[in-house]
Regions:
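Glycan-recognition and catalytic cores of secretory/periplasmic carbohydrate-active enzymes
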Residues: 1-248
Length: 248
């Protein structure tokens, strides 16, 4: 399968995460970390790196926040590449990926504020919802030492909007809550902890069960991702919270 994929990489022009080069490169990178792919990872993914970089930095780019076909998906790919211990952190490709990562953060910072008003009106149940991914990826970007001060300042600037944001669906509330708790393992912000407490106190876990159908098996809307969110909540939400027993 991998031989066929790599042989056809040059024929793909779509750089998106769900059906394009970014997602394929992400999968190859994970397999390389597990020693299932041999060779220099920077050579193997050279063309993918170039395609993603071009897509992110072209002047007429008009990408949304989506994981599937937007800036969050590109950021997932870039961060996974730079975290690979076998990646050359001193090479030219690393410099380009770092630049592309900063461009992604800039794009998010420019787009997100105009969308905050829709947070409370979003009637689409989705575990891979755009907004939580922003905060998950911000944390991973800071962990690599990229744009740390800018991201801290942006979170502070957005704090008022986040404090007023209560998504309509309980699954989306849990998703946003987990992303805040995960981000706060790096920021250690009392204000962000307050956002976590606010969301937790407004999650009806019985209601959450009604929102998730055991008959849906896709990762975005089904029980699999809801279970994963609950597992992440147990990892990142302090066990002294009053709702911890309900999470468990």
């Amino acid at each position: 399968i991998l031989d066929n994929v790599q042989a056809n990489l040059a024929n793909l022009s779509n750089a998106h995460f769900d059906k394009g080069l970014a997602g394929i490169g992400w999968a190859i990178n994970i397999l390389h970390e597990q020693n299932a792919v041999c060779g220099d990872i920077d050579d193997i993914l050279y063309n993918v790196d170039a395609a993603v970089y071009k897509e992110i930095t072209k002047h007429d780019a008009n990408v949304g926040l989506s994981v599937t076909d937007g800036v969050n998906g590109y950021l997932v790919y870039l961060l996974s590449r730079m975290k690979n211990p076998k990646h050359d952190c001193n090479g030219v490709q690393h410099g380009l990926m770092k630049k592309a990562t900063m461009r992604c953060v800039d794009t998010i910072c420019g787009q997100a504020p105009s969308l905050f008003s829709g947070l409370t009106k979003d009637i689409y149940i989705s575990a891979i919802w755009n907004f939580p991914w922003v905060f998950v990826l911000f944390k991973q970007t800071m962990d690599l030492g990229i744009y740390t001060e800018k991201i801290k300042a942006v979170i502070q600037e957005w704090s008022h909007y986040l404090r007023c944001s209560l998504p309509y669906y309980h699954l989306n509330r849990l998703s946003l809550c987990v992303s805040f708790a995960y981000l706060n393992t790096t920021l250690h912000s009392r204000e962000l902890e307050g956002h976590v407490d606010f969301l937790l106190s407004n999650i009806n876990f019985a209601g959450l069960r009604r929102e998730v159908s055991e008959k849906i098996f896709n990762m975005n809307e089904g029980w699999f991702m809801a279970s994963h969110l609950l597992a992440m909540a147990l990892l990142y939400i302090p066990n002294n919270k009053s709702v911890y027993s309900e999470l468990a």
